[in-house]
């Protein structure tokens, strides 16, 4: 396995670790509605950071974006909006299926759809079937899916042991939402694929290869921001128990506390895709679809490890922790299989 591929896998791991941890600051926000908290964090992660970093990277910010036709920008934007819809469905999936089953089904579907649909769309699916490297990466995707399933089972055992149940368990509704969440969340993978002309244009302007994907986030995350912020603002306006004005009428120190924590959560959310871009840049072009598989499987891996570090599994008993550990090992094995496949 080459150093470039190893570093690509490593940066995807770092990005996934940030994704697994990003909600921790949000949990410390006090006396704010989820909608206000999510909006503040989202403005930081989907608007301020992508625009600020792109402005630093590009020699002429407006000239860069105005150089693309609508036919180039629109698919990137719409796939970003597609991801935004998946993001909203994610919370509803947890409500009706519970954390473990909801995450397992949604992540499993988005891993498959986001990874395998990209080469199909590009007409390169034969690479997966007809080459040794392609077959190995395909095997790695399958092993990763098994690992996600094992970690999901560990979560179910933990919830059963600790008496944790879904907020409003509804299998039929939950499964529909989980499938929708999995499919729509893959929009981020499709957006990155559609944004290749933007990456190439950034490279032509002299942007470092590690950073060429970052300017496309202005458009991708702009699409996601409209969906997420629109959802939050509509609820803040229509739901009687929610009030943006009330949330910002608290004591000034508490408002500052909440804004800073929400902004930190937004920063950590953004960093997952900052390092995703670094990892993506190190993956061989013919296997770039594997970036999504690495990100999603490492997200599950890091989520399990973070849960252990935060002692969320302390009262779960030995069996759930053993199953979780097995699932984490399987995901690590999957990453190595994929790495060896890309090296062929």
Curated annotation (Swiss-Prot):
Give me the segments passing through the membrane.
4-24, 38-58, 68-88, 101-121, 137-157, 175-195, 214-234, 259-279, 290-310, 323-343
An example GO CC term for this entry is: plasma membrane
Q: What keywords does the record list, in alphabetical order?
A: Cell inner membrane, Cell membrane, Membrane, Sugar transport, Symport, Transmembrane, Transmembrane helix, Transport
Q: Please indicate if the UniProt record lists Transcription regulation as a keyword.
A: no
Q: What is the protein name given in its UniProt record?
A: L-rhamnose-proton symporter
Point out the gene that encodes the protein: rhaT
Q: Which residues form the signal peptide?
A: none
Originating organism: Escherichia coli O157:H7
Q: How does it sit in the membrane?
A: Multi-pass membrane protein
């Amino acid at each position: 396995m080459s150093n470039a591929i190893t570093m690509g896998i490593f940066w995807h791991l770092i990005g996934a670790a940030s994704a697994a941890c990003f909600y921790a600051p949000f949990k410390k926000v006090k006396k704010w509605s989820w909608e206000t908290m999510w909006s503040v964090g989202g403005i930081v992660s989907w608007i301020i950071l992508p625009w600020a970093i792109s402005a630093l990277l590009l020699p002429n910010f407006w000239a860069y974006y105005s150089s693309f036709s609508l036919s180039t920008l629109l698919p990137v934007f719409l796939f970003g909006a597609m991801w935004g819809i998946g993001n909203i469905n994610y919370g509803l999936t947890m409500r009706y299926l519970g954390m473990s089953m909801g995450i397992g089904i949604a992540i499993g579907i988005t891993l498959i759809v986001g990874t395998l649909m990209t080469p199909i769309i590009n007409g390169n699916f034969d690479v997966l079937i007809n080459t040794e490297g392609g077959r190995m990466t395909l095997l790695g995707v399958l092993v990763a899916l098994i690992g996600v399933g094992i970690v999901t089972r560990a979560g179910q055992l933990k919830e059963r042991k600790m008496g944790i149940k879904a907020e409003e368990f509804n299998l039929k509704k939950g499964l529909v939402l989980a499938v929708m969440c999995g499919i729509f969340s893959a929009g981020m993978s499709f957006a990155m694929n559609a944004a290749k002309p933007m990456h190439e244009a950034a490279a032509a302007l002299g942007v470092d290869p590690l950073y060429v994907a970052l300017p496309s986030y202005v458009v991708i995350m702009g699409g996601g921001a409209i969906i997420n912020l629109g959802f939050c603002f509509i609820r803040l306006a229509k739901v009687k128990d929610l009030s943006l004005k009330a949330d910002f009428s608290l004591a000034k120190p508490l408002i500052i506390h909440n804004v800073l924590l929400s902004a930190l959560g937004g920063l950590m959310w953004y960093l997952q895709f900052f390092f995703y871009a670094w990892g993506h840049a190190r993956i061989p072009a013919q296997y770039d679809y594997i970036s999504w598989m690495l990100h999603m499987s490492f997200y599950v891996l890091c989520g399990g490890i973070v849960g252990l570090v935060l002692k969320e599994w302390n009262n779960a008993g030995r069996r759930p922790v053993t199953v979780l550990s097995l699932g984490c090992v399987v995901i690590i094995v999957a990453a190595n299989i994929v790495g060896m496949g890309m090296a062929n």
